């Protein structure tokens, strides 16, 4: 447990000793005279010379892409519990900001998110799950800041080009409709809007976007640019007065706690508008704790936003478990409140947007950092971190070596804080299980002597919050159900008359968009189906495949039988597939291997070892046309695979040596309309 040492009056020492007997299970806190303390650094916290920059909050990203995909399928009460740990004030991560992807139909890291406008004359503000997530966040914290940012765009905006700036007015219109729709259909006020995630910005587009926002009465919506690097946008703003005027926040990604001179010269708010992206182990928590402090200490960034909010996607997709917490098993209800949640709480539960950093923040003498914030009404929060190099490496950028060692740190409260009588203390220690504590409340610290100082003994990988606020809480629920594998028998007939979400449970679209569909041409068995709805390639953010594909199941499945009814809508050139042992997804989807069983409207079939269709195991002619339902069956057992069409054998015992395991999948030959029904898988590992 932490040893933190206080220079205090005799009255406080007596109080501490008498209280110790009744404090079983709480922190052991020895209090010593100043004269007995080991030498160490002294740090003054003072507002006499004014305050630093305004604090804008700590948040996280849902999307970029499909990172919350499995969350929506969780049964209650577990889904609500997960949301409470993320958003409920004074309970868990208690986030101030939620940033969501404006779905654009393209692959954006771990899947695709649907656009509200698949086609030029199409508008639907109930697709996907980001609307729902924003409402759930607002339900828990009405003051939460909402941000929207596009990663990809629907293809029609590009007019044949893979570029969103072909028609600046049209792209601005598309983005503004999303903001207007959020308010009209969901009563959500979007606070900030971004440009194009980690891709090129267009200065004229930003200016047009501002004008169009104003024309719709959306003057309150502020613009963040450019969600990439500091350099280009900052330099451009210094040279372009109109651009300078319309950009409210300069947002950089993975800045390594540093900003650049041009960004600071603008005087604009500086944000780390995407950061973290690290496995949510204790090392990830150390990364998060270090950058939450040092983004301001080193770079004057007043907001830090984590990618991603919750690791709610299949773990074997890229960046598995790189969320603040993990919720990737809706079939079992199991979830894990990971240590980054409690590291977040050290800042989020004891500050609010609109507070101000003190000017007196900085680095500790023997490693680590400290920040202090105030609401200007007498409240003070101090956050101290001593994260070691070994246990605080983020996924990027490269972290130069630094050393952290045991030290004594004396903090002196001056200015309006000199008369503060008491500070609440919250503590985290990362590392060995026997020494590990997460967001533990310690005995409060009384400051009864006249100089308002206290001394802490700090060791590596620790996090302290000392605050005048008494509202902190480590929320908890009964443990969720135990972890379970994806069911080895899984069926979905897609018979949902009024679906709450547009996507079927557990299917994770990797290229294309698969939605519940009411087939008015078939009032019978196939009245309700799952349909691939994109008819052109989106303006991509990643390397989307040339085929559409949605994965499902357990990545460790080896032997399985997949059966599905399929319906090709495109004559002559159309085609569909079912697949097993699919070994890649996300931004790697183009190179996915597996066993793919295709049929085509031109009367042919094919069996391939990859999604791209380069590895051909078998091919031939078959009686297949468009606009007819067929049943495909794919059986994979050991080193061999077989396929059936309408329950009749079409090909048998084809050798398949690689891959050994992977997901099940459905998809289409190109960006084309097609339907799927009565999906059924039987699997063994």
UniProtKB/Swiss-Prot annotation:
Annotated glycosylation sites: 143, 379, 403, 451, 556, 559, 602
Catalysis performed (reactions): a beta-D-galactosyl-(1<->1')-N-acylsphing-4-enine + H2O = an N-acylsphing-4-enine + D-galactose; beta-D-galactosyl-(1<->1)-sphing-4-enine + H2O = sphing-4-enine + D-galactose; a D-galactosylceramide + H2O = an N-acyl-sphingoid base + D-galactose
Signal peptide stretch: 1-42
Pfam families: Glyco_hydro_59 (PF02057), Glyco_hydro_59_C (PF21708), Glyco_hydro_59M (PF17387)
Molecular functions (GO terms): galactosylceramidase activity
Binding site for substrate: 109, 151, 197, 396
EC number of the protein: 3.2.1.46
GO terms of biological process kind: galactosylceramide catabolic process; myelination
Top-level taxon of the source organism: Eukaryota
Cell compartments where the protein resides: Lysosome
Catalytic residues in the record: 198, 274
SUPFAM superfamilies cross-referenced by the UniProt entry: (Trans)glycosidases
Function: Hydrolyzes the galactose ester bonds of glycolipids such as galactosylceramide and galactosylsphingosine. Enzyme with very low activity responsible for the lysosomal catabolism of galactosylceramide, a major lipid in myelin, kidney and epithelial cells of small intestine and colon.
Similarity comment: family membership: Belongs to the glycosyl hydrolase 59 family.
Annotated disorder: Defects in GALC are the cause of globoid cell leukodystrophy (GLD); also known as Krabbe disease. This deficiency results in the insufficient catabolism of several galactolipids that are important in the production of normal myelin.
Descriptive protein name: Galactocerebrosidase
Lineage start: Eukaryota, Metazoa, Chordata, Craniata, Vertebrata
């Amino acid at each position: 447990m932490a040893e933190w040492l206080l220079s205090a009056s005799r009255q406080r020492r007596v109080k501490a000793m008498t209280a110790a007997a009744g404090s079983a299970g709480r922190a052991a806190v020895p209090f010593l005279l100043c004269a007995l303390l080991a030498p160490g650094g002294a740090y003054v916290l003072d507002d006499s010379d004014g305050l630093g920059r305004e604090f804008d909050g700590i948040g996280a990203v849902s999307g970029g892409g499909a990172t919350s995909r499995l969350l929506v399928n969780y049964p209650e009460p577990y889904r609500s519990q997960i949301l409470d740990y993320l958003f409920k004030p004074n309970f868990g991560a208690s986030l101030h900001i939620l940033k969501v992807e404006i779905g654009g139909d393209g692959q954006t890291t771990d899947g695709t998110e649907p656009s509200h406008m698949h086609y030029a004359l199409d508008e639907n503000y109930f697709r996907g799950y980001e609307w729902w997530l924003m409402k759930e966040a607002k339900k828990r914290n009405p003051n939460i800041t909402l941000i929207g940012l596009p990663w990809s765009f629907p293809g029609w905006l590009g007019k044949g080009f893979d570029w969103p700036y072909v028609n600046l007015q049209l792209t601005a219109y598309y983005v503004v409709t999303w903001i207007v729709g959020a308010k009209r259909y969901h009563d959500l006020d979007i606070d900030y809007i971004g440009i194009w995630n980690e891709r090129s910005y267009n200065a004229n587009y930003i200016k047009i976007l501002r004008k169009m926002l104003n024309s719709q009465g959306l003057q309150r919506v502020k613009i963040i640019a450019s969600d990439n690097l500091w350099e280009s946008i900052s330099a451009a703003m210094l040279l372009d007065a109109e651009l300078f005027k319309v950009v409210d926040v300069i947002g950089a990604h993975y800045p390594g706690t540093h900003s650049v001179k041009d960004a600071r010269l603008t005087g604009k708010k500086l944000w780390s508008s995407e950061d973290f992206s690290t496995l949510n182990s204790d090392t990830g928590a150390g990364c998060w704790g270090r950058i939450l402090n040092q983004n301001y200490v080193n770079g004057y960034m007043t907001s830090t936003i984590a990618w991603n909010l919750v690791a709610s996607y299949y773990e074997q997709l890229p960046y598995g478990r790189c969320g603040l917490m993990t919720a990737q098993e809706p079939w079992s209800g199991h979830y894990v409140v990971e240590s980054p949640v409690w590291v977040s709480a050290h800042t989020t539960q004891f500050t609010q947007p609109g507070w101000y950093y003190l000017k007196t923040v900085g680095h500790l003498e023997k490693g680590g950092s400290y920040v202090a914030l105030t609401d200007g009404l007498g409240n003070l929060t101090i956050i101290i971190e001593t994260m070691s190099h070994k246990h605080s490496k983020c996924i990027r950028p490269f972290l130069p070596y630094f050393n952290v060692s045991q030290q004594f740190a004396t903090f002196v409260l001056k200015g309006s804080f000199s008369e503060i009588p008491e500070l609440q203390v919250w503590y985290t220690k990362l590392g060995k299980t026997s020494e590990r504590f997460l967001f533990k409340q310690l005995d409060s610290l009384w400051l009864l002597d006249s100089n308002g100082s206290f001394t802490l003994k700090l060791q590596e990988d620790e996090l302290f919050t000392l605050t005048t606020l008494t509202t902190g809480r480590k929320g908890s629920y009964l443990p969720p159900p135990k972890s379970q594998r994806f069911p080895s028998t899984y069926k979905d007939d897609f018979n949902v008359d009024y679906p709450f979400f547009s996507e079927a449970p557990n299917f994770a679209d990797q290229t294309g968009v698969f939605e519940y569909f009411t087939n008015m041409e078939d009032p019978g068995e196939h009245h309700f189906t799952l349909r691939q709805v994109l008819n052109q390639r989106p303006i991509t953010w990643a390397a989307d495949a040339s085929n559409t594909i949605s994965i499902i199941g357990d990545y460790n499945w080896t032997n399985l039988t997949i059966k599905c009814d399929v319906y090709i809508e495109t004559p002559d050139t159309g085609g569909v597939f079912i697949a097993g042992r699919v070994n890649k997804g996300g931004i790697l989807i183009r190179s996915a291997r597996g066993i793919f069983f295709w049929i085509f409207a031109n009367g042919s079939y094919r069996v391939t070892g990859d999604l791209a269709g380069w590895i051909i195991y078998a091919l031939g002619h078959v009686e297949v046309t468009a606009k007819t339902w067929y049943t495909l069956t794919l059986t994979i057992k050991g080193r061999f695979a077989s396929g059936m069409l309408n329950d009749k054998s079409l090909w048998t015992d084809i050798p398949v040596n690689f891959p050994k395991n992977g997901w099940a999948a459905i998809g289409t030959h190109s960006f084309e309309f097609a339907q799927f029904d009565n999906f059924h898988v039987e699997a063994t590992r």
